[in-house]
Amino acid sequence: MHFYLQNIKINTLKFFIFVLFFSSCKKEEAAKIELFNNPVLSLDKPSNFPEFDSYNLRTNAPTLVGVEIGKKLFFDKQLSRDNTISCNSCHISSYAYGDHNSQAIGIQARVGLRNTPPIQNMIFLNTYMWDGAVIDLKDQPIIPIITHEEMDSSISEVLRKIQKEDTYIKLFKRAYPDGEITSKRILECLAQFMFTLISANSKYDKIMRNEDVSFSAEEQKGYLIFQQKCAFCHKEPLFTDQSFRNIGFPKNPNKIEEKGVARVSGEKADLYKFRVPTLRNIEVTAPYGDHGQFTSLEEVLSYLDQGVENDTNLDPYLKEKGNRIPLSKEEKKYVISFLKTLTDYTFIKNNELKIIKT
């Protein structure tokens, strides 16, 4: 009898230990679930747009917390060596994430080589930068971070700063199972935020989607002229064909550094070729050209009308047209009226920085 009771006590004790252990495990598991809660975001593709770039989505799908980390990093001056500028210093939302300087201005008022390109619809593109130096968006932030004329820092220095900040520590614990802050993840999160910067709500877009909006007579004339004389390079709906062309714009005085795509490829055939920029939100992204050669759209169109600089590798389309795109005074006015329909006021006014609670 005594042996039987002793067995019951032992078994009961084992049962309670098991219950406590199981309960503890469940609590730990629940805590982990609460800590790591980072669903993949479903980006809405505008109906009049092409498919997203599959490589970017496959290798770095945007997540709820990843995007928030990227947004915080984008506005964080710690990415620069002396903590004085952030990505947002040059990429300002009200200018379609560009700025109004001819060339980018970095720390200590250093002047960069090129005009700041706007950040919009990056998820639809397959290469980045004026010269196509980057094919994976998560590698793009490395260039401004390490460039002497821009942030003049290093990835390791940025990592050191970010790893010390309590808000980032909490956010990374929510974003990744192990909570580790790494340089790779910093770059991935920046790219995820940039993926969400989709501009597709201009007057033009609403017309293309049959949303009970129509062009004015002047805008309609401009659209027809645009289709005849501009759409060869600035293809709808992104208003770029993502090609690189030498269109005979005035050259950057810094001829030692500036070679266009040839700076990357080393090929003479690529001299002074640059990415065909998107014309979306063009109304708010002056000045124009690879180093801000033109202060207004009128200047750009007048230059194309008068005749561009001749080069051995000038784009064949321009050569066929006698090195110019002829436009009358009225045509220029109509084209500019149309280009203003590409302004997405919802996009350029969306400048709030809201970080999720940690």
Describe each model-derived feature in a short phrase.
Residues M1-K32:
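Bacterial Sec-dependent N-terminal signal peptides
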Residues C25-T358:
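Periplasmic c-type cytochrome electron-transfer domains
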